[in-house]
Amino acid sequence: MDAQSSAKVNSRKRRKEAPGPNGATEEDGIPSKVQRCAVGLRQPAPFSDEIEVDFSKPYVRVTMEEACRGTPCERPVRVYADGIFDLFHSGHARALMQAKNLFPNTYLIVGVCSDELTHNFKGFTVMNENERYDAVQHCRYVDEVVRNAPWTLTPEFLAEHRIDFVAHDDIPYSSAGSDDVYKHIKDAGMFAPTQRTEGISTSDIITRIVRDYDVYARRNLQRGYTAKELNVSFINEKKYHLQERVDKVKKKVKDVEEKSKEFVQKVEEKSIDLIQKWEEKSREFIGSFLEMFGPEGALKHMLKEGKGRMLQAISPKQSPSSSPTHERSPSPSFRWPFSGKTSPSSSPASLSRCRAVTCDISEDEED
């Protein structure tokens, strides 16, 4: 047993130290890769009663030390593993993989118990014996399958199949009135322990199905199975159909809620965009208004220019003193209609009064 454990440790070390891509190992965080092999198993494992055995050659069991060192190719170590293998799952496959890799040269024989033995000692199975045989046959680690395997291994059975070691997990298996059906195998030094895979078993799978029975029953009714095939009563069938309709309505309501939320979100985004655009346009409008009507706006400049032109029109600038003076011709007297009085002549005093009135008007406009 010590040699076996040391061989397993060494094999694990070799796997860890094997270089991966770019010389990296598993310790570097990069899993090592193996070469792709196109050669694989093309046929299922044969049954034991279909294999010709040469009983003329004597059968001599190998020891644990010899098995760990390695045996010749023509004499592999014959390891036997048995079980029910109902609803064949990854836990079964891993157990058989461990049994296959116990020794460098291993021939794995797997025994599958019949329906009669299983129903008597363990309970009812989901799959019948033929389905369980077929499932084990197609496991890649299996070299031979024994149908109708015994519940307790006898010396005659071990000798008939020339078994060197029996592989199973080390947990005592109490059944058939015995605390451990593998106790005599352990005492004989023929027991090779394997590790049970936690979190997966046939009982766990059945528990999941029973826990969610209504879900799976409704699912199969939708897929065309009848209530009779599912062993479902008439009332439960109608209940499942009603639940299915309710679930569809709930789904539609949920879809509508999600779509309405998306619509509201889009409206909020659009409203935010509109508000931002409105603020920008308002700023532009206010800026344009101030440019036109503000204290320094264009309108004030226009009024100033108009006022200046009006002042120039009312009181034109006098010509410089250097220029020759021109005498004005006396303006003709204006006669008011229906009166014999003439219009008063423009005097310097009247011109000064007119200028004073114009200045007052301009000051009022500036205020």
UniProtKB/Swiss-Prot annotation:
Main subcellular location of this protein, as a coarse class: cytoplasm
Modification Phosphoserine, positions: 233, 315, 319, 321-323, 329, 331, 333, 343, 345-347, 350, 352, 362
Matches recorded under Pfam families: CTP_transf_like (PF01467)
Residue ranges of the region described as Amphipathic: 228-287, 298-315
Pathway: Phospholipid metabolism; phosphatidylcholine biosynthesis; phosphatidylcholine from phosphocholine: step 1/2
Membrane topology: Peripheral membrane protein
Catalytic activity, EC: 2.7.7.15
Keyword line: Acetylation, Cytoplasm, Endoplasmic reticulum, Lipid biosynthesis, Lipid metabolism, Membrane, Nucleotidyltransferase, Nucleus, Phospholipid biosynthesis, Phospholipid metabolism, Phosphoprotein, Repeat, Transferase, Ubl conjugation
Name this protein carries in UniProt: Choline-phosphate cytidylyltransferase A
Catalytic activity: phosphocholine + CTP + H(+) = CDP-choline + diphosphate
Name of the encoding gene: Pcyt1a
Tissue specificity field: Brain and liver (at protein level). Also found in heart, kidney, spleen, lung, skeletal muscle, ovary and testis.
Extent of Low complexity compositional bias: 330-352
Function: Catalyzes the key rate-limiting step in the CDP-choline pathway for phosphatidylcholine biosynthesis.
Species, as recorded: Mus musculus
Modified residues (N-acetylmethionine): M1
Repeat positions for Sequence: 319-324, 329-333, 343-348
